[in-house]
């Protein structure tokens, strides 16, 4: 290569012109640029040779001359000619086409235009081939989309900055949703998020100079006002729908405006009965009521009236399919997510005080010992007389209110019934139960005591379930029977060594097998019943609604809407959704339990050692007795089951499900209760 040859090579990602000075060795040359700076290059690094006869002083003028010729629009005109001719070109040929000569300045300008072009030409060796018309059209379309995306990206960043500066001031656009949803999924699923979502979310976080972590994504969504500080990630990870589709809401409205014909035209009129509904004060879906009467022959009859949503819902309609998809009403500390639209669930479906309501009523006569002597099941009309809370009923029973003898009679039969089930092998487990509520960001925890009112309602619901199952079994009716295998409990002598109360109940609870839903009736061990089906919550539990569909059709003399095979198929999908709902409820309650403890980090709590989780690691389950919360705790000293402790929160992080408790006062080993420990 001659000294004085002007060449192009790339330096730090940019074109660079230099004049060849001398060889350095057999493989390298020394070239000098316009700043008289020397560079050592390999000939393979040369991307274009302009020609000999140049000095470094001439480079700036040469570059200025080239700059005047760099018109990208002229390349399109040349492409139109060449694509029609089907001819490839090199820089010299393109210079001739564009500038009508092959002067070094124009040839180099043509080289720059061709090598920088990504639209009209593609390089093949030393020549450039024109792309086809369709290829150019596709590339232009892609470029337009890329430009649009870049503009949307820049606009999104601008809106994000505005929202961070002034929360609530931004109207998000449809084009923002993909990035914001990716951010939500990254914060929700964390390391398990889709890689594409993670990448998009991390790009947003990086652009806002925030850590590229799921926790930072969560904090950003809160700062933007899109999420609450205590956003329910368990609910977001689930498939549980929060909003009702428009078609379902439309059907609910139409059923309210124009009620369908009642399939049970011969409903029994029970409006003469005094009906008590007994629930928590916050209950909105009122699905059961109780009555008591004395028959002409002197026998006493209990009535358990269950709300009849099948008056408003038919198998396979929009309301039914949506309820099936949800499977249950979800009860969370922050509120409920209903199975049916609220306007119909808390309206005509519910047993509202003073209104004539449709019900499925179970009339039961018990033997003096508490066994079912006779029963009847009828579609009915009732008029609930009183809406009472559990506290109201407990007070009435305590005071012996003479004006309401029905309440005392129902409570008496509830106790008889409980004793009868105990004689049949029922297994009672009375563990403290916490009710966690969040109202206006205030977290409260209330212990639900096993009061007489709660016991009598529970016994009546269990009674209705036994009667429904008996009816299904007697008529060979496909129903979702609920069964529970007999547990293998520790020997009584071993249980008696444990402190009575929560410790002993915890040991029994640990041995209890899960209840199962089956089309075949079988014993329910913990209830002490030979057959049982849940039917008392059809507004909020889809399996109960299924039982109503089946029983009511049979009462009318019709073929049940679901065959055994169809019922089994529906139950499989419903059971999976119900299990997910239970998981969300459990995890959400735990989160708010930990949040309550975080807010009361300096408070002292009375703890009780329930059982060992891993005794060799000194890891036990403790019960915070005032709160009904069960938490794992690791000890650094010997402890005994049933030992009472004074505890304080050492560290708690609700979002990451971490809590560490510590003892405030540590007794000596000699002070430990002498209790046989049952792992």
Q: Predicted segment positions?
A:
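Compositionally biased alpha-helical segments
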Residues: 50-61
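Major-groove recognition helix of helix-turn-helix-like DNA-binding domains
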Residues: 108-113, 126-130
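A short, conserved structural fragment
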Residues: 115-127, 227
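Accessory beta->alpha helical hairpin/"wing" motif in late/C-terminal subdomains of nucleic-acid enzymes
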Residues: 124-140, 236
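Short, amphipathic alpha-helical interaction segments positioned at domain boundaries
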Residues: 136-161
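Low-complexity, highly charged intrinsically disordered N-terminal segments
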Residues: 168-272
């Amino acid at each position: 290569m001659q000294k004085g040859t002007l060449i192009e090579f790339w330096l730090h990602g940019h074109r660079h012109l230099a004049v060849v000075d001398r060889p350095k060795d057999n493989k390298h040359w020394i070239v000098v640029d316009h700043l008289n700076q020397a560079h050592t290059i390999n000939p393979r690094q040369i991307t274009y040779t302009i020609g000999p006869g140049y000095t470094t002083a001439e480079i700036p003028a040469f570059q200025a001359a080239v700059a005047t010729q760099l018109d990208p629009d002229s390349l399109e005109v040349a492409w139109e000619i060449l694509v029609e001719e089907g001819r490839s070109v090199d820089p010299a040929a393109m210079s001739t086409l564009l500038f009508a000569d092959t002067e070094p300045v124009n040839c180099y300008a043509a080289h720059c235009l061709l090598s920088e072009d990504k639209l009209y030409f593609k390089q093949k060796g030393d020549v450039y081939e024109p792309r086809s018309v369709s290829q150019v059209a596709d590339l232009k379309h892609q470029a337009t989309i890329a430009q649009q995306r870049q503009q949307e990206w820049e606009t999104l960043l601008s809106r994000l900055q505005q929202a961070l500066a002034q929360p609530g001031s931004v109207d998000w656009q449809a084009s923002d949703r993909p990035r914001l949803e990716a951010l939500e999924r990254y914060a929700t699923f964390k390391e398990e998020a889709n890689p594409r979502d993670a990448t998009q979310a991390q790009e947003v976080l990086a652009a806002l100079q925030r850590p590229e972590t799921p926790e930072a994504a969560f904090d950003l969504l809160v700062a933007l006002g899109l999420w609450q500080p205590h956003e329910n990630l368990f609910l977001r990870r689930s498939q549980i729908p929060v909003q009702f589709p428009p078609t379902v809401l439309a059907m609910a409205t139409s059923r309210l405006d124009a009620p369908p014909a009642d399939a049970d035209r011969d409903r029994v009129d029970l409006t003469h009965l005094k009906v008590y509904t007994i629930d928590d004060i916050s209950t909105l879906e009122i699905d059961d009521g109780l009555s008591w009467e004395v028959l002409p022959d002197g026998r006493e009859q209990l009535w358990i009236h269950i709300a009849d949503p099948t008056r408003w819902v038919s198998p396979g309609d929009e309301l039914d399919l949506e309820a099936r998809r949800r499977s249950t009403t979800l009860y969370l500390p922050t509120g409920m997510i209903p199975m049916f639209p609220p306007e119909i669930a808390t309206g005509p479906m519910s047993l509202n005080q003073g209104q004539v309501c449709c019900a499925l009523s179970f009339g039961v006569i018990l033997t003096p010992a508490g066994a079912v002597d006779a029963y009847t099941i009828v579609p009915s009309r009732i008029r609930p007389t009183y809406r009472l809370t559990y506290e109201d009923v407990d007070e009435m029973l305590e005071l012996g209110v003479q004006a309401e003898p029905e309440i005392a009679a129902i409570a008496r039969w509830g106790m008889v019934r409980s004793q009868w089930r105990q004689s049949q092998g029922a297994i009672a487990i009375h563990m403290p139960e916490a009710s966690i509520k969040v109202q206006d960001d205030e977290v409260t925890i209330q212990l639900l005591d096993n009061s007489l009112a709660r016991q009598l309602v529970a016994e009546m619901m269990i009674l209705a379930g036994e009667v429904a199952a008996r009816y299904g079994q007697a008529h060979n009716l496909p129903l979702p029977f609920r069964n529970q295998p007999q547990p293998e409990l520790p020997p009584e002598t071993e249980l008696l060594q444990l402190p009575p109360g929560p410790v002993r109940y915890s040991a029994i609870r640990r041995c209890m097998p899960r209840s199962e839903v089956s089309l075949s009736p079988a014993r329910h061990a913990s209830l002490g019943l030979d057959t049982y089906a849940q039917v008392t919550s059809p507004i909020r539990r889809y399996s109960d609604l299924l039982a109503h569909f089946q029983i009511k059709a049979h009462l009318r003399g019709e073929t049940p809407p679901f065959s055994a095979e169809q019922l089994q198929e529906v139950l499989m999908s419903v059971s999976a959704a119900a299990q997910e709902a239970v998981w969300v409820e459990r995890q959400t309650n735990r989160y708010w339990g930990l949040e309550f403890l975080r807010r009361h980090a300096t408070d002292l709590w009375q703890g009780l050692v329930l059982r060992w989780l891993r005794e060799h690691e000194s890891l036990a389950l403790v019960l915070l007795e005032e709160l009904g919360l069960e938490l794992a705790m690791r000890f650094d000293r010997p402890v005994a089951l049933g030992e009472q402790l004074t505890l304080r929160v050492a560290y708690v992080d609700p979002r990451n499900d971490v809590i560490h408790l510590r003892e405030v006062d540590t007794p000596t080993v000699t002070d430990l209760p002498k209790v046989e420990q049952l792992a």
